[in-house]
Amino acid sequence: MTTTDSPSVLQDKDIDRLVNAQKKPQEEPTMKDKALLFEKQRQEKKMKHTEAKMETNPLTSAKTFRKAPTEASTATTKDSTKNVNNATSTNNATSTKNNTKNTPKNTPKNIPKNTTAKPPIPKSAMKPSVPAAAAAVSTSAATAPAATASVSVSEPAAAFSPASHDMASFMTGDTSAAIECLMNGTSTSTPQKSASGISTNKHVNAAASQVNNRSNTSNSFDSHTTQKAGSYNPNITNILSERELDSTDCYADSESRSQPHKPSVLLPTTVLTDNKTPTYPPSPEFFSDHTDARDVRVGASFVNHKQPYNFARNNHGSDVSSAMDNARRQASETRRSNLSSYNDRNQPAAHSYLRTAPNHMEKIRTEVDKEQTREKKLARERLARKQQRDKFDLLQTPQTKNKFNMQVPLDMSEEQLFEVICKLTTQLDQSQARVREVEELVQQCSEQLNERSVEIDSLKSQYEEGQGEKEMLVGQLEEQLKRVSEEKDVELRQATERMEKELNDVTATKDHEIQQLKQQVQDLTIQLSSATVSDVKTLRTDYEHYKSQCYRKDVMISELEARLQREENLEKFETELKDKEKRLIKTELRLGQQALEQDHERQKLEVEKKVLGEKDEEERLRERLRELGSRDRSYNRSSRDRSHDRLYERSPRSRDRSSRDRSRDRYSRSRSRSRYRRRSDSVKDYSVGPRDKGDLRSLALEKIIDFLLARQKAGAQRAHMDACYNVSGPGVRYGDGLSDATVEKVLKEFLNKDEGYLMDLLEGDGKRLDEYLGTIYSGVGV
């Protein structure tokens, strides 16, 4: 159980080898590995000794080994993880020896080469002390019999771990496979009183799955969290609860039993909400405790005693609208509080097949990021360490505080020292070779530099030549510019002199012209002054003559205006007379029409009365006859005849009554319908034949006026209906159908027509006239 804690190169190397075991090619077991294995065997002997002691006292063994395995495993795993990689060849040898010892006669003959024969479980495994010891020993790859048992039993665990191999890995020296085999296979425990191999396999599976839990959690959703043995992981296919494992299991009490039971399958359950609130998957506690599981509806409250809404209770006033607002606010607040409390109480499961809550996802993401950054940091440190190790130099002074100062442990063997020295020399050779390479590189670089410097010198000389040429050119250009500027100045001077001469000439000529013009103006003014005096005299005489003529014209105009006024007044009086005549004719016609209507109605009423009177008399007579008949024959008749007669009596009476009702209905209907049609019908009653030709104009006028009146009545009724029921929109109203413009237009049309035209119009019972009137009427705005 002793560990060498002194810092050494070997321990770090071994850690790195374990980490990179998958990547490295297969190695042969070295001298160092053999030396380490020798130490292992020494430790195994010690363990055997303690085991023998424990077997003698079975009572204490159960108690002590309850705690022992965890301590032993924690103590020894440090060594095992460092040194298991090297424990291949001799372990293999010891296991084969032990197999030969422990194998009884009934071993199967046909065993494949790569596998070892399965021995039956030794008697020591039946005792309660052994499983614990085996577990403790196997974690650190301890005692030979235990090792063989563990390896042989771990063969069925190949189904679980993808990298686990059989004993062939030990033979071939595949170190990574051997480590996998030891890690996955040996952390088993044989239960008490297990005679057959089946039960051991079962527990091996359970333990192997637990180990896989710890190592291979890359598939599970929360791979950043460490999975403890027995913790809930839905990716494990066969889940064994703690109650199924035996009480002698070495891991029985290492995990607390206080965790609640978690189901293997989370079924999706519906939570009724409105669409705005997210739905979370139910918590695992939902299955065990139904009291807390509530659905979060819009109005639902977690307060069981619900108070009825009180209008007096609101603070914002007693009117209904504010009360409604208050109620709405309350509902939304309760919904919010319900949701928050529900989320607090039922936090979603870590892996749910349903939607995970966004805040939970954020937590998970942050944890994952932390884990990744930590891993990156570790990897970086490891790489830095490796680089330092590569640079390791023998000539380092011991004063420098370097990790790799050779503090050799006392128990290091010669082989190990020899190997270390070999390695260091190879490293030195490599570094010298590298130095040589670097020197060659430096030489090459210096040659290139020399070449480049030569090129630069040549370029510089070229550049200087170019600069000289440029200066020459610039000088020439400056001289040219000077020459050109002088020439331009001379030209300008000449031009200005020329212009000045021309200006002087022009000004002299202009002055002469101005003097001449002034002289002319003076002459003209003298002439004008003499002429105006004579002109004024003539103008005055003309003006007086004109004035007298104008006065005469004014007198004439006033006379003409008076005459025009008289004529206009006469025309006005004539038009007024015509209008009055028209109105008289209209009123006479209207009165005649009304008289006609009244006569018509009176006649109808009389006829109706007569008809009704006759019918009533008939009815009365029939009733009387019936009564008399029924009195006479009531005693002589049978019931059948009576009923027959009754039917006979009923039918004509009912027929009569129905016909009477129908006639009444018809009359009333026709009356109501003809109320608005009568005038237009009466227009068509006129016939042209018997009248005189001189009477045609008056007949046409009568017909026209009738038409217009009918139109007016229809229009008025329509306007009335419109006002009552607002049939058309509010802006559109029917006029009463008879505006002054319409009447005037129609009458003018007809007063101007000749008789032949009127005859044509009135032919065919006045149909042409109706059509004509329709066209006129539609043309005029009502």
Curated annotation (Swiss-Prot):
Residues forming coiled coils: 361-628
Compositional bias segments (type: Basic residues): 669-678
Keyword field: Coiled coil
Positions with biased composition (Basic and acidic residues): 24-54, 326-336, 629-668, 679-689
Record's compositionally biased regions (Low complexity): 82-118
Chain spans, region Disordered: 1-127, 205-234, 308-355, 629-689
Keyword field contains Coiled coil: yes
Composition bias, Polar residues: 312-324, 337-346
Protein name (record): Uncharacterized protein YALI0A18139g
Species this protein is from: Yarrowia lipolytica (strain CLIB 122 / E 150)
